[in-house]
Amino acid sequence: MSVMNTFSGKKFDPMHMNSEDVSLEDLAHALSLLCRGGGHLKYFYSVGQHSINCMKEARARGWSKRVQLACLLHDASEAYIADIIRPVKAHLPEYYKIESKIMTCIFDKFGLGDLSEEENSRWKQLDDEILDHELRELMIGEKDRPVKSLASVPDMTERNWKDVAEKFIILAEALIKEK
């Protein structure tokens, strides 16, 4: 059994984790320190900040608190198994299985284990739409990338990871109480 250590001091095997292993503190900390796009951006922009932008777009569209929370947590598995860029991830079917198992634990932990197909499609849609805006803004050579209009203005400024982690926790705790 391979054990990982998390920021909060938890120790568990990520290949056999359960919802009790999930910690909001660990998610916020790790996601705020992981750079999007494999680090090939104009400056550091975290998975945590991306997740906050997705959640704020869901809120601006008037979507349910459950969908807003799902948007905030949609990349949370990356806190435990890091991020792999889409062009590579598409060739790693085993990664998808592991990611899915971990996401099930995370969604179960926060009461989202019963998301409907429509609710899941909404957070996936926003993930793609925000990604297009991020690519246009943060990657060299993508300035002319076509993007869909958003209801919000994503914050893609360079942010301190501690501020992102704190905001992630505040938003998550509020949504958990309200959903």
For each feature predicted by the language model, list its residue ranges.
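Metal-dependent phosphohydrolase cores
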Residues: 1-179
